[in-house]
Amino acid sequence: MSDMNNPSDENTGALDDLWADALNEQKATTTKSAADAVFQQLGGGDVSGAMQDIDLIMDIPVKLTVELGRTRMTIKELLRLTQGSVVALDGLAGEPLDILINGYLIAQGEVVVVADKYGVRITDIITPSERMRRLSR
C-alpha cells in the first residue's frame, strides 16, 4: 500500500509530466493580454454603423422646461395662497431664463412671443464644465 503523502518515484515523474503538460497548454491558450480582451482597437471603423446607433435615440422624448425663477415657502404660506396671490421668485426681471432638459440645465435664454404664444430664444449653451460647477452648488 503506498502512502498518498509520499508518492513513489515513478508516480512523481508522471505527476510532473501532467503538470508540465497543463502549464504548456495554459501558456498556449493565454497568449493574448487581458487588455486585448477588454479593449478593442480604435480606428476608422464603420461610420454608417455609428450613425445608425445615433438614429436609434433620435426619437426618444425628453422634457424641456423653462424656469422663470424659484422660491421657498412653508406649508403654511402655501396653504394661504388664493386666486390673485403673487409669489415672488428669486429670478430678476430681464434676467436669462434657465432651460432644462429632463431637469438638467443645458442653456439659458430669453422670452419671446411666437404667433401669440410664449417661446424662448436660446442665448447661451452651458458647457459641460459649467454644468458640473452648477451641480456642485
UniProtKB/Swiss-Prot annotation:
One Pfam family named in its UniProt record: FliN_N
Membrane disposition: Peripheral membrane protein
InterPro entries for the chain: FliN, FliN-like_C, FliN/MopA/SpaO, FliN_N, FliN_T3SS_HrcQb, SpoA-like_sf
Tagged with keyword Nucleus: no
Predominant place of localization: membrane
GO molecular function: cytoskeletal motor activity
Sorted UniProt keywords: Bacterial flagellum, Cell inner membrane, Cell membrane, Chemotaxis, Flagellar rotation, Membrane
Name assigned to this protein: Flagellar motor switch protein FliN
